[in-house]
Curated annotation (Swiss-Prot):
GO molecular function: rRNA binding; structural constituent of ribosome; tRNA binding
Gene3D superfamilies for the chain: 3.30.1440.10
Protein name as catalogued: Large ribosomal subunit protein uL5
Cystine connections: none
GO cellular component, one term: ribonucleoprotein complex
Function: This is one of the proteins that bind and probably mediate the attachment of the 5S RNA into the large ribosomal subunit, where it forms part of the central protuberance. In the 70S ribosome it contacts protein S13 of the 30S subunit (bridge B1b), connecting the 2 subunits; this bridge is implicated in subunit movement. Contacts the P site tRNA; the 5S rRNA and some of its associated proteins might help stabilize positioning of ribosome-bound tRNAs.
GO BP field: translation
Length: 185
């Protein structure tokens, strides 16, 4: 007997509820025109790694726990003498989430992590790039439940970029609103 295939909660909601609503609102003629999530990129810039390489390892492990997959260590493209930075030195970690992991991360971000942010008043609705992609930043990575607060040696900030197939910012904003992104009015 075949096992039931697991599908993330937000993906099911998108396919069954959000896509028909968006089709009706923007009067799309084809289902492939409807905006959908393409990928989510998580980036941690670790500037202190120039002096101490152990900090990259710590950020690497934390991002791996948050994303659920192995991050890539980013290296400096050029040397900058004022920062004592040489070309090729590790200065950050990033990971790209797609498919089911992307929906799972988005679910955890909206339902668990963002409500745990101190003094949170909503996300800036103007942080779109003009092509339907949304960028936001978190000052503390400890808002994610996968990170044990007692075992963290340093608190890192992180960038979160949500890439969609939307042609305009209005379409992307409406799509992310359906996913319960808490935009300010």
């Amino acid at each position: 007997m075949a096992e039931a295939q697991y599908i993330p909660r937000l993906k099911v909601q998108y396919l069954e509820k959000f896509r028909p609503e968006l089709t009706e609102k923007f009067s799309y003629k084809n289902l492939l025109e409807v905006p959908r999530l393409d990928k989510i990129v998580l980036n941690m810039g670790v500037g202190e790694a120039v002096g101490d390489s152990k900090k990259i390892k710590s950020a690497f492990e934390d991002l791996q726990a948050i994303a659920g997959q192995k991050p890539v260590i980013t290296k400096a493209k050029t040397s900058i003498a004022t920062f004592k930075l040489r070309e090729g030195m590790p200065i950050g970690v990033k990971v790209t989430l797609r498919k089911d992991r992307m929906y799972e991360f988005l679910d955890r971000l909206v339902t668990v992590a963002l409500p745990r942010v101190r003094d949170f008043r909503g996300l800036n609705a103007k942080s779109f790039d003009g092509r339907g992609n949304y960028a936001m930043g978190l000052k503390e990575h400890i808002v994610f439940p996968e990170i044990d607060y007692d075992k963290v040696d340093q608190i890192w900030g992180m960038d979160i970029i949500v890439c969609t197939t939307a042609k305009t910012d209005d379409e992307a904003r409406e799509l992310l609103r359906k996913f319960n992104f808490p935009f300010t009015k």
